[in-house]
């Protein structure tokens, strides 16, 4: 866990651009993969446990995908791809690790992405500009949990996540 730079508010607010003009993402050819950062920079309880890293990737994916607006997933993000972005050059070919799907922790991450994307597809009213959105996703909410609350068309949901490395 790293509170620095963890404010997710820019996924939804802070732009004069019309809704849907900005694409939210957590990794790209310019942004290091979050799974690689967990492996190389994480606290020992995270970087030494594939299960912990994949659970954190699932949490990050849920928060990315549950904020309204268009999203981009980068090459194999849904599998917890933890190869450094400079492998073969930033925009070069990356090794494909289909065997990741044979690992139960990575398969669970993949399935979590599928579930979240299905939720988005089945409930489009939550993810358009008319939804009522409340985000508690800044760096100040690092220790007490981040939340996303969305209401639309008489329905609502709340996503709560502990990004800290403790169980608090």
What positions do the PLM features span?
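Short, contiguous acidic/charged loop-to-helix segments that flank catalytic cores in large enzymes
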Residues: 45-52, 97-107
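Active-site His/acidic residue clusters
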Residues: 86-98
């Amino acid at each position: 866990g790293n509170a620095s730079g963890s404010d997710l508010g820019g996924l939804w607010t802070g732009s004069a651009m019309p809704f849907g003009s900005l694409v939210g993402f957590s990794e790209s050819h310019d942004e290091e993969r979050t799974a690689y950062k967990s492996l190389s920079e994480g606290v020992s309880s995270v970087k030494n446990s594939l299960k912990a890293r994949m659970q954190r990737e699932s949490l990050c994916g849920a928060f990315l995908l549950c904020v309204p607006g268009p999203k981009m997933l980068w090459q194999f993000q849904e599998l917890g791809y933890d190869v450094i972005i400079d492998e073969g050059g930033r925009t070069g070919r990356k090794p494909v690790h289909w065997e990741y799907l044979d690992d139960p922790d990575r398969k669970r991450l993949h399935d979590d992405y599928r579930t979240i994307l299905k939720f988005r597809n089945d409930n489009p009213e939550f993810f358009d500009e008319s939804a009522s959105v409340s985000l508690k996703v800044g760096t100040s909410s690092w220790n007490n949990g981040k939340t996303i609350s969305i209401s639309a068309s008489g329905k609502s949901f709340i996503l709560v996540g502990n990004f800290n490395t403790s169980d608090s």
